[in-house]
Regions:
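Arg/Lys-rich amphipathic alpha helix in sigma70-family domain 2
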Residues: 60, 74-93, 99-105, 123, ...
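Sigma70-family region 2
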Residues: 49-64, 83-85
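Amphipathic, Lys/Arg- and hydrophobic-enriched alpha-helical face
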Residues: 19-38, 53-55, 134, 186
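Structural recognition of an alpha-helix C-terminal capping motif at a helix-to-coil junction
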Residues: 43-50, 63-75
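Hydrophobic-face residues of short alpha-helical interaction/recognition segments
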Residues: 27, 31, 56, 69, ...
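A short, charge-rich alpha-helical start-of-domain segment used by transcription regulators
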Residues: 3-29, 39-42
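A short pre-motif secondary-structure segment
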Residues: 144-148
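C-terminal edge and immediately downstream basic/flexible tail or linker adjoining helix-turn-helix-like DNA-binding
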Residues: 2-7, 15-16, 91, 160-161, ...
Length: 194
């Protein structure tokens, strides 16, 4: 190997790690939410990182690396689970009223002085319980909700990551919110939160 080529490889590796390092924990958290397994999440992040490194030459410098990487991560997830895809059909957005959580928290007297009933429930649940509620969503809604609520991506970034129209993102997020309200309430009641 020529010394100049070796220097170039080291520079590319350093640049990749400078961009990838700060998002590693967030990517791992997303992978755990997508796969519902820490072991599978490890494999998914490793596969996505390898794919991203191999495709790093196609990354446009100055654009959003996090969104670019999350596109690779979600594509890797979908590729891995395409054959074994099994969605939980127990929650249907059509069955959940738009103000479900508002109604239930008011009925149970949990709302109190807080202006947001979701906050009233979330304050009484730890992160694991909120994660349980998020995990109960069907895959399409779970992915969009995770990217929006956990990873703080914008509608446009999520559309770019998932390679779908922004209207699809909005629709899935709207339905996902409704299903999440019901799931949060069910988790809260299972845990005897009051």
């Amino acid at each position: 190997m020529i010394a100049g080529e070796e220097t170039d490889i080291v520079a590319v590796q350093a640049e990749f790690m400078a961009l990838f390092g700060p998002i590693l924990q967030v990517a791992y958290g997303t992978a755990v939410r997508l796969t519902r397994s820490r072991t599978e999440a490890d494999d998914l992040v490793q596969d996505a990182a390898l794919l991203a490194y191999k495709a790093f030459g196609t990354f446009e410098r100055g654009t959003n690396f996090k969104a670019w990487f999350f596109r690779i991560l979600t594509n890797a997830f979908y590729s891995r689970h395409r054959k074994e895809k099994h969605e939980k059909a127990n929650l249907s957005s059509e069955e959940v009223p738009a103000l479900y959580l508002y109604q239930k928290t008011a009925e149970a007297g949990l709302w109190g002085s807080e202006s947001d009933p979701a906050a009233a429930i979330m304050d009484r649940l730890d992160a694991d319980r909120v994660g349980e509620a998020l995990d109960s969503l069907p895959e399409d809604y779970r992915v969009v909700s995770t990217l929006y609520f956990i990873d703080d991506l914008s509608y446009q970034q999520i559309a770019d990551v998932l390679q779908c129209p922004i209207g699809t993102v909005r629709s899935r997020l709207h339905r996902g919110r409704r299903m999440l309200q019901k799931a949060l309430w069910e988790v809260a009641m299972e845990r005897g939160i009051n």
